[in-house]
Amino acid sequence: ENMTFGTTLVTNPKGGFLACGPLYAYKCGRLHYTTGVCSNVSSTFETVKAVAPSVQECKTQLDIVIVLDGSNSIYPWESVTAFLNSLLRNMDIGPQQTQVGIVQYGQTVVHEFYLNTYSTTEEVMDAALRIRQRGGTQTMTALGIDTAREEAFTEAHGARRGVQKVMVIVTDGESHDNYRLQEVIDKCEDENIQRFAIAILGSYSRGNLSTEKFVEEIKSIASKPTEKHFFNVSDELALVTIVEALGERIFALEATTDQQAASFEMEMSQAGFSAHYSQDWVMLG
């Protein structure tokens, strides 16, 4: 009843036909999927059997820690909070869903809040908007990453067994403790922490400096494949332009069953838009 979009009719080789149509859509991450129903109809127009595939589970459990460079060279800070706001609003945050914590570093490291501090998207967004830049004349990126690994991803602070750990590192300069970076990244690899690294080129552009060494360092922080885990933006204002791509790549980590999958779009099935009959089986889509 009331099916006006996507209705499919397919002839049954044994007589009669199959009629399909979508029922309703449900959201999983940033994407929407439609379930539907198909009915076998006899040559005398009697319904023989109805088939309605069950809705697949939408997996959105991730433990995400955002590691923010808050040193003096980040400017304006409002662009960082705008980036956080845009990224967080598209996450389904909760104790049984995605959890988010934020660490800020410069010369020292501060936990702004832990994975289990807040339990709704609104609470996390409000807390992120209240974060103030702590400053510092040095950029201790290795220290920031290692502190997040050691302290933020603990069960006491909300990390869950069996849930994918994700770290998002945002920085605008080469680290002053880069001699420790490889050791710290190796530890993250050992603990299966997926890392997305974002290089902000603003301070280099303002100072007319080469970005080559900086970009190479941030690429070394990102998980493999690098092209899926590394981003660079021209300045702080441009951070919001990568939110959609970053969000989709983060969500794909849990939503895809294949660890090497690059996209979530083909992972969830739909029914009601198409059908194909063979002698012994029916394919729905």
Curated annotation (Swiss-Prot):
Keywords: Cell adhesion, Glycoprotein, Integrin, Membrane, Receptor, Transmembrane. It comes from the Eukaryota. GO terms for cellular component: collagen-containing extracellular matrix; membrane. Glycans are attached at residues 2, 40, 208, 232. Gene3D superfamilies: von Willebrand factor, type A domain. CDD domains: vWA_integrins_alpha_subunit (cd01469). Residues 1-285 are extracellular. The keyword Plastid does not apply. Its main location: membrane. Transmembrane segments: none annotated. One of its GO terms (molecular function) is phosphatase activator activity. Signal peptide: none annotated. Residues 66-279 form the VWFA domain. Integrin alpha-1/beta-1 is a receptor for laminin and collagen. It recognizes the proline-hydroxylated sequence G-F-P-G-E-R in collagen. Involved in anchorage-dependent, negative regulation of EGF-stimulated cell growth. Belongs to the integrin alpha chain family. The integrin I-domain (insert) is a VWFA domain. Integrins with I-domains do not undergo protease cleavage. This is Integrin alpha-1. It comes from Gallus gallus.
